[in-house]
Amino acid sequence: MQVSVETTQGLERRLTISVPAEKVDVEVKNRLRQISKTQRINGFRPGKVPPSVVQKRFGKSVRQEVAGEIMQRNFVDAIVAEKINPAGRPSFVAKSNEDGKALEFEATFEIYPVVELKDLEKIAIERPEVDVTDADLDEMFVTLQKQHQTWKENKRKTKSGDKLTLDFTGRVDGEEFEGGKAEGFELELGAGRMIPGFEKEVTGMKAGDEATIKVTFPEDYHAENLKGKDAEFDIVIHKTEGPILPEIDEEFAKLFGIEEGGVEALRVEVSKNMARELTQAVKAKVKTQVIDGLLAGHEVDLPSALVTQEVDVLRQQAMQRFQGQMDPKNLPQLPAEMFTEQAERRVKIGLLLGEVIKVNELKVDETKVNELIASAASAYEDPKEVIEYYANNNELMQQMQNVALEEQAVELLVEKAKVSDKKASFNEIMNPEAK
């Protein structure tokens, strides 16, 4: 086998490989011999078909089939010999594939880029310093109460937190528009479900009131024909209801699976969950800063094959989310461009973290793997069952090992980075958009 390597452009490489004619011809003849033993051809007894007949009928297709197999095998041998690390599958082109002649073909593919890590100590991180306070716990209990609140009809003027049942008809430029009309619509004031200004205009109304309100659609509204448009809505209020929060007592605790210990036991359990979620959120915030700093400090050529693969993964995930929400017949065709930027980011992160792992010779820490599994399992009713499920599923274990290795790489980068601790509150970390 003769091999030559050519750099075509960027990360693209082309191997030209020549395989001696005798090697190809021997495989073709052996394959044709097998066919002659099994193939039924009119006018000949099984196993008695003359080689010339087999060659005439099957020679061309068999040679193409054999050539494809030889190209695959010799490509693998060539990249091992040349110490080349391809990113993605190669494309093959046979330049010469005739009886009695050497099989010459080209394999075009991309390689992984050379990644050089630098200035890791310049990555700046603000690490949140935060605990779960009694006030945070009290606020969480109010949230839990609201999750189990009931409603009581009233006749007073509405305020934030109340629920309205209303009809509305919207118009833009005097014309009704699609999606602008509803009857018996339930609206919780303060939930932010409607366009800006709508809830404010109906707050203070009471059952039986009718009014026409004026609002403006935001410039970034999803419907192109309504962006920035002034609108009028005719409103009819049918019913108003105020929230009734449940008492925080033993019965309330039982709603969350606490059969013994009452409210105090519930506070302990909720506090544990909050602390676990807070730890994960802080870790995620630090990781985001590390990754952003790593990306900003490095330029990396990205193999288009890897980006394409990642686009396909992201698009498939998006389609799966849509499938649970709408009729498969109406599923949209999602263009690759929607996912390209995210795919490029993910590929770049993978290449950089892969280099961190390689340079520092990081190995999977099984203790960390077990901690990650235990943390994931703790959110379920029967953690032992979840842990056992992971232990018996090789694919899930591999995924968790990859997560652990990635976390080890991030932790190493944090050690090298400039880290400053900054005091923060539970809400700032858990609800950053509410700031």
Curated annotation (Swiss-Prot):
Belongs to the FKBP-type PPIase family. Tig subfamily. Its EC number is 5.2.1.8. Pfam families: FKBP_C, Trigger_C, Trigger_N. InterPro entries: PPIase_dom_sf (IPR046357), PPIase_FKBP_dom (IPR001179), Trig_fac (IPR005215), Trigger_fac_C (IPR008880), Trigger_fac_C_sf (IPR037041), Trigger_fac_ribosome-bd_bac (IPR008881), Trigger_fac_ribosome-bd_sf (IPR036611), Trigger_fact/SurA_dom_sf (IPR027304). This is Trigger factor. GO terms for molecular function: peptidyl-prolyl cis-trans isomerase activity; protein folding chaperone; ribosome binding. It is found in: Cytoplasm. SUPFAM superfamilies: FKBP-like, Triger factor/SurA peptide-binding domain-like, Trigger factor ribosome-binding domain. HAMAP family: Trigger_factor_Tig. It catalyses: [protein]-peptidylproline (omega=180) = [protein]-peptidylproline (omega=0). NCBIfam families: tig. Its main location: cytoplasm. The gene is tig. GO terms for cellular component: cytoplasm. Residues 161-246 form the PPIase FKBP-type domain. It comes from the Bacteria. PANTHER family: TRIGGER FACTOR CHAPERONE AND PEPTIDYL-PROLYL CIS/TRANS ISOMERASE (PTHR30560), TRIGGER FACTOR-LIKE PROTEIN TIG, CHLOROPLASTIC (PTHR30560:SF3). Consists of 3 domains; the N-terminus binds the ribosome, the middle domain has PPIase activity, while the C-terminus has intrinsic chaperone activity on its own. One of its GO terms (biological process) is 'de novo' cotranslational protein folding. The lineage of its organism: Bacteria, Pseudomonadati, Pseudomonadota, Gammaproteobacteria, Alteromonadales. Gene3D superfamilies: 3.10.50.40, Trigger factor ribosome-binding domain (3.30.70.1050), Trigger factor, C-terminal domain (1.10.3120.10). Involved in protein export. Acts as a chaperone by maintaining the newly synthesized protein in an open conformation. Functions as a peptidyl-prolyl cis-trans isomerase. Keywords: Cell cycle, Cell division, Chaperone, Cytoplasm, Isomerase, Rotamase.
